[in-house]
Curated annotation (Swiss-Prot):
One Gene Ontology cellular component: extracellular space
Record: glycosylation sites: 226
SUPFAM superfamilies in the cross-refs: 4-helical cytokines (SSF47266)
Family: Belongs to the somatotropin/prolactin family.
Disulfide bonds: 28-38, 87-202, 219-227
InterPro entries: 4_helix_cytokine-like_core, Somatotropin/Prolactin, Somatotropin_CS
Protein name: Somatolactin
GO MF terms, alphabetically ordered: growth hormone activity; growth hormone receptor binding
Major subcellular site: secreted
Alphabetically ordered keywords of this record: Disulfide bond, Glycoprotein, Hormone, Secreted, Signal
Species in which this protein is naturally found: Carassius auratus
Length: 230
């Protein structure tokens, strides 16, 4: 109990600190727009998108730890995750060498990030709703599921703005997100828990990919030099 309390206090401090500086990637909190649409520089948009992705990844890691603790309290240890069926079927790989980084385009980076972001929007909404029905779900876990759902939707809006700014109108044909309902439906209580855990378990991995790809995009657009993941 003491360990859980300390963990929750630390998490609240970190999340609140990050939230204090991160709104939506497309907000203009420091400008008096007087009813006119504000204009944010590309550098600022990329900076906010990276910050958003970092926050989302951080919350996903925390959520996984909190879910692990909840499973232990339920007497469940080493819950098996079948990544082939529960994780994103559209694999977006992170470049593994300097040669690969040089070969990929900014369009590929934007498209890959958008695919990952859009894929997880509905599953995260479903997990948020599902956790509300748990009898003993920690409030910290429920709160983080809501925050993940909100932030991933905000990040999608920011990515769409970045696509228009970097590639221009029509520069990337944006398809609707893949229907993931068949991947995450279950009426069995244990399978529901497994499904919810699988979503968080898999999402934190893709959240790290999103963060990595956005950092690379920001470097290529703004810094221009020494853009490497190594």
């Amino acid at each position: 109990m003491k360990k859980t309390t300390v963990l929750q206090v630390c998490m609240v401090f970190v999340v609140c600190s990050l939230q204090a500086v991160i709104g939506s990637p497309v907000d203009c909190p420091d400008q008096d727009t007087a009813g006119v649409s504000c204009i944010i520089s590309l550098e600022k948009l990329l900076e906010r998108a990276v910050q958003h992705a970092e926050l989302i990844h951080h919350i996903a890691e925390e959520s996984k730890l909190l879910f692990d603790e909840m499973l232990i309290s339920f007497g469940v240890v080493n819950l098996h995750i079948s990544e082939g069926t529960m994780c994103s079927p559209k694999t977006v790989s992170v470049p593994m060498s300097k040669t690969e980084i040089q070969q990929i385009s900014d369009k590929w980076l934007l498209h890959s990030v958008l695919i990952l972001v859009q894929f997880w929007i509905n599953p995260l909404v479903d997990v948020q709703a599902s956790l509300m029905n748990y009898q003993n779900a920690p409030s910290a876990l429920v709160d983080r599921s809501k925050l993940m759902s909100t932030k991933i939707t905000s990040l999608e809006q920011g990515i769409l703005v970045l696509i228009r700014q970097i590639l221009g109108e029509g520069g990337l044909v944006v398809e609707g997100p893949e229907d993931t309902s068949d991947h995450f439906v279950s009426s069995d209580t244990f399978e529901t828990v497994r499904r919810d855990y699988s979503v968080i378990y898999c999402f934190r991995k893709d959240a790290h990919k999103i963060q990595t790809l956005l950092k690379l995009l920001k470097c290529r657009q703004i810094d221009k030099e020494n853009c490497s993941l190594f």
